[in-house]
């Protein structure tokens, strides 16, 4: 066992040769490297698979022996300071390593087909492999300096992948937004690291925790300064894990390729913030104020992310806000001190969310045959619907991921989310009410995404549903706005007018007109990007199922979604593998070793949580299930529903909720108005002050010197009369001064 731990340092470096060799090959032998691009993809998967096997071996040994291993190399600079580098293998490291490698392998296999049409295929795999290396280095770090180095590398890789299609202005802006937002958190993280080094004199986790606990117990530190340093450390996690108020970069990050969205949301960048807080829990646990602050930020993010997901038309952005809300649950659990449930939910959510993102990528991939390589169209749920007939495997996998995230047993997220919800009652009834109500919101918006995507009819064609009359009652979204229209002399079809807008621009359920799309209109829909040699060979008016290379990872993730939750079933300690796995960490956090519960208590809590989820699903089905397609005469329904005061009031509430959700809670607008515009005005004022004041003073002195010199030069023109005039003038002035001084 000791020998296995000694070679654990190789874990972060195994995937590293792939990006290095790809870069070297593209520099020296570009043609040969591009012709062998599938070989590089295979090597990426192979090396990451070796890391996964290594991580599994370490995890099995830790489950059996509950051991922690650390090895460091000391770089002595002088007698007062030493910088150490090494690696730490503990339950948290092994959990994160398995999570990164398993999800990473699935994403790499999936990407081979998904990115096959793209000229940046090799660049994508180089970034992905380096991303895995950076994240593995982060989770195996033994001190705060290494954490910060790999933290920045993880951020760099995410920026490169978010802006992968950098020729698209939207993707470039999304990359810049992610960079600037994370700069705020990373600067706070750096200040926090330096602050705790100033307090304890060490970067190593073990020494840091031990020294700090001794200082706290002896009351030898300033509590205000310690809390400030802890908040600065936590600021890094807020930005990385998209917690309020530094969450604004996450939905825009969907401009990157879908596979990287799956990796970022499941096992890498957003998980890094949760990992950092979990790693520093022994530090935070002795600072009560910071624990309360962590839980407060978590509960705000839980509710905020869920409400912002209600009105999204983009399938990936809806899933992004879902990730934000679920990360809030994890942060809430960590703030409550529920270490086990937070990591449990991190595991279950990772596989469920990876399944959902890869499923959405399969949907987008199939929609591109109809609307082309245009994210605004291929990711728009308003144009989808009825896909269950065309992509049945993707539909079933997406449904399983949806039900898991909704908290339906026995799927993975049910077990972990239920633990967090139950623990919230013990911590704060107010937090518990918000957390439980948000569980209903989660079920609602996830079911909404599923229904808009797979149920009903294929709305990109938008034919009448009954076959006899145009039926405008089946309107896609209570929350959706009218999109852009296609204008053409021969095209009398509005591509996304699925909700008829009234005079004030609000969505209306009842309209008098429905526009149909003829064959000429369908033929006009072409890809906005035509890539030679990589164009789709299949052309169809309907979507089709993805290739086996994309379906295989989805099927594997289905197995994880079905069975990974059983790792932490709390009925019996003998089968509770997760508790055995986390035994050292649980003891460190002063948690009880008895994690088993009785059947009655579990069933009582489970029935309540499942009932809330079912209520959210029911509301979603009531609003979005295409039950109206069977009605042939809509005048009957229009005559029943009348515009009364109650209807007007309910419409105002719906519109207010829609505006809040669709406009991202106005946080982006607030930042744009006060921060972005404020910084620009400050820059303009600084520019004015620099040019007119700072530069104006020396320029003015120079100008005055030039003017005086010109005057003196004109005086010394060589005329004797001028010299005599100035001579007598100066003598007269001096005599007058002398006279007045002697009065």
Swiss-Prot record:
Q: Which subcellular locations apply to this protein?
A: Plastid, Chloroplast thylakoid membrane
> Does this UniProt record's set of keywords contain DNA damage?
no
Q: Which Pfam families match?
A: Proton_antipo_C, Proton_antipo_M, Proton_antipo_N
Alphabetized, the UniProt keywords read: Chloroplast, Membrane, NAD, NADP, Plastid, Plastoquinone, Quinone, Thylakoid, Translocase, Transmembrane, Transmembrane helix, Transport
In alphabetical order, the GO MF annotations are:
NADH dehydrogenase (ubiquinone) activity; quinone binding
According to the record's subunit comment, the protein's assembly and interactions are: NDH is composed of at least 16 different subunits, 5 of which are encoded in the nucleus.
Q: What is this protein called?
A: NAD(P)H-quinone oxidoreductase subunit 5, chloroplastic
| UniProt source species | Helianthus annuus (Common sunflower)
The record's gene field reads: ndhF
